[in-house]
Amino acid sequence: MGKMIYTIKPEHHGIEDIKKILEEHPEIQFVSFMGVDIGGNGTDEKIPVKLFIKDMEDMLKYGIQTDGSSVELQGIADLSDAKVDILPDMDCVWFVDYNYEYYNDDNGLPVGTLKIPSFIIHSGKQVCSRSILKRASLNFQNELMSLFKKYPELTKSYGFSHDDVSEIALTSATELEMWVKTPEQSADFEELHTSQVLKEQYWKRTMGTVRTVLEKIMTQLECYDLKPEMAHKEVGGIANRIDSKGRITHVMEQLEIDWRFSETLQTADNEIFIRELIEDQFRHHGLEVLFKAKPIEGVAGNGEHVHLGAAVKLKNGKRINLFAPTDMKAQYLSEIGYGALMGILKNYEVVNPIVTATNDAFNRLKPGFEAPICTVTSLGGSKESPSRNRSVLVGVIRDANSPLATRFELRAPNPYSNTYLVLASSYQAMLDGIDKVLDAGLTMDELEKELSKKYGEEGVYLEKFREYRSEEDVFEHYTEEERNKLYGKAPATVWENLSAFETNEMKQLVLKKGEVFTDELINSFKESTVQKWKNELAGRIIHDNIMLLKTFVKLHNEQDHATDLDVVNWEKIVYLKTKLMKDSMTKKCIFTKIKNALNEGDFDTASDLQKQMNEKMTEIRGLYIQYKNNIF
């Protein structure tokens, strides 16, 4: 049995190198060009490796053609102009995706597919998520070099000049949280909730099949040179159940897997591949993986913290973190760091629709589950001690003894957020803040004061009637009314979030700077997101709610020693069920009203009704648990 190859690095993307590698590895039998559409979906196809080798020069130069109407490029590639090209990216890592259920006859190794991250091109323009992030990265680097030339005193404070710069490196990192469970089995909500409150699972030892798969995944990440850093149990889940033969029969655990940072575009590519690898490994062992933001109502959801960094590489080989101050014990951040942080916070209204773009994502972003809903940051109580505030949107990660580790942590994304667009929009927002604060010429103390401004105070860059910094737990320290006043009222539905593009046109220009995003791309994203929102709301969420409500049946009768409390609770349940799902000749229920509003294109009304539905569904779930627990 020969040795498997897991990646092909950019330095080996020459035609002769690729041919040699493929001929030496007959287990690699297919090639797939992975373009990523505006919805964050990776394309996958199976091109026989013999055909790829035969036509390699043309395929690498011109790509392959496909029907763009089958991917999410609404408003760009439609039925009348559907042709798109998928063009290989020659400057990134290519992965070999192995099928461990199908083995090559020649050498006994698993059959592999060479996955080549690619760009989607329509009418000569790159229109995919990968291309947007690539443009954002180049725009950030080019604009920062221009600022270095414009403000020589800035680079002087770091100990270099713009002529000394070899490269501006944007580094990012993500992680994945997931629920792993036995298929077709579910755990009792109260059991899960109690285990979470008691922290019975957090960082506990994994056992059985879950341990085996987790260790296999970490080993495989090493093989792919993805530099895994940690895997552990998260707060959700319950203890495994074992049958009389010692076999685990019921699994319901929440896990987290972390790996090392990389260049921004490579970071997003890595995440897609790692997510697929994790799914394959658990499914191969008979377990289901849930990456949804909120797989189970009422217990911990899955977040995906996105880390954002920037550094310069000098021609002498030295690396300097641009967000770290020259004296870590005298200041929290550098001028560039303050500007970048304020840029995200000020422009988050147009970043948020990209970060939180699904009904599922909004199910997670609620008070009480360590999920951020307020546009606010925390610097820490003092320069020497880092902030540990987990209630904020943007965390500042810093270590006084390690300036290179300074970065920002955006805490709102989830595993199904489009990481390419999240990174692109975040770096565009950061660039706006950097440009504005450098132009204002603020001192370090003035920058800290600007970020720490109080509600009603005029800001040089930040808005007057907002606050942006809190060292308190914003959920414990403030009421909902106070949070809405200080940090702005958070959107509660996909439609409310998307509406921010229209109400914040000046901030939308921040995304378009350098033609990173265009009107065409933003409109395509909006159209795609609205379609998914309304189709899921009408076709899945309402249907699932109806199925759930039908399980809420009367349990008491006179023979069961029913009390007046049972009668009252049941009457409340019937009232809510009727309000939600039962029409009469003269009155429509909430579910019907939502469907009618969606069909009529009245999305404002549908969004308001969705909020009512969510509130009443939460109320009736809790009420039925109380009612059921009081029955003999």
Language-model segments: what does each one mean?
Residues 145, 149, 219-226, 283-287, ...:
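Generic secondary-structure signature for well-ordered alpha-helical cores
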Residues 172-175, 179-189, 232-258:
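Active-site-proximal, well-structured secondary-structure segments within enzyme catalytic domains
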Residues 1-228, 262-276, 421-422, 427, ...:
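ATP/Mg2+-dependent ligation/transfer catalytic cores
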